[in-house]
Amino acid sequence: VFNKKIILFEPNSIIGRSNKFLLKFATKIICYDKNLKGIDKKYLHKLIEIAPILNKCFYEKNTSIENNENFLSILIMGGSQASLFFTNYLKSEILQLSKKYKVKVTQQLSKGFDLNNYKKEYINNNIENNLFFFEENFLCKNYKFDIAISRSGASSLAELAHLNIPFIAIPFPYATDNHQFINAKRYKDLNCCWILEEKNFNSGDIYKIVNQIMVNKNDYNKKKSNLSKLNENNTWEKINKKLIEYFNDN
């Protein structure tokens, strides 16, 4: 195309439709997952796997944070599009957990919701809370969480993974080519997270997972350890050096 070399970028674990079309014209495709789904075998030689590219602020965080034994800090976030499902259904899960455990919740709400009205039940149940609407790089400023409940966009999961925050993934069920589920499954296969599908979601599902963690932390600690191993050698300098070297070679 115009005698220019084309290098594609694919953060998801299944190739996007635009990238799939352009791949035949491209020199290489940079991706996070060496087992990228949906790619024709004849193009496998074009794959270049790299560690997730995050905002520089993420590489400056101390990710070896000890859990606070006095309370459970939970993050709920739905990504750039937020999640009406999370806003409508996850409050009851937090209330249920608070009856047995001391809980602190940081929750992203869908636009249009009244923050003050939404938090009343949290306050009435003595749940420390921080409610917010979508913010770019929110986790750069707030990252001391024991567990997260999240949609499964590639960037959101990469940020949680880098910060060693085990997460319960609830993929957006209408994502193109089911890419959010496939993103989450990659981490599930590496024993880094739990997955709940929205279509099968029942009241108490979050409680069951978190209660199991509180009773026996072995599985939780294993997931946290696996996340740490995924990112132990990833630094801002190393990732940028690798990219610069690659572009200079091509």
Which positions does each model-derived feature cover?
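Conserved donor-nucleotide binding/catalytic region of nucleotide-linked donor-dependent transferases
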Residues: W194, N200-N231, D249-N250
